[in-house]
């Protein structure tokens, strides 16, 4: 249990940060799933459109430090390859 005022404040800040970060991580997962669904559906135009939006989301989350930049690059690379492989 936090005893000092500083420790109590950090607990409050950590709760806010955890909620914000979990929301952003959820947004990331949703963006990735939407691209995967478009690929499975076989709609290349939709997949490319959703892919461009998801790249923006992935980059913004990486820039905020929620995920590492290499993880962001890995997601973008794999999604890009999957979209291009649709033919």
From Swiss-Prot:
One Gene Ontology CC term in the entry: cytosol
Entry annotated with the keyword NAD: no
Gene3D superfamilies xrefs: Ribosomal protein S20 (1.20.58.110)
Source domain of life: Bacteria
Region (Disordered): 1-26
Transmembrane segments: none
Protein keywords: Ribonucleoprotein, Ribosomal protein, RNA-binding, rRNA-binding
InterPro entries: Ribosomal_bS20 (IPR002583), Ribosomal_bS20_sf (IPR036510)
Gene Ontology molecular functions: small ribosomal subunit rRNA binding; structural constituent of ribosome
Gene Ontology biological process terms, A to Z: translation
Record function comment: Binds directly to 16S ribosomal RNA.
Similarity field: Belongs to the bacterial ribosomal protein bS20 family.
Full protein name: Small ribosomal subunit protein bS20
Organism, as annotated: Nitrosomonas eutropha (strain DSM 101675 / C91 / Nm57)
UniProt lineage: Bacteria, Pseudomonadati, Pseudomonadota, Betaproteobacteria, Nitrosomonadales
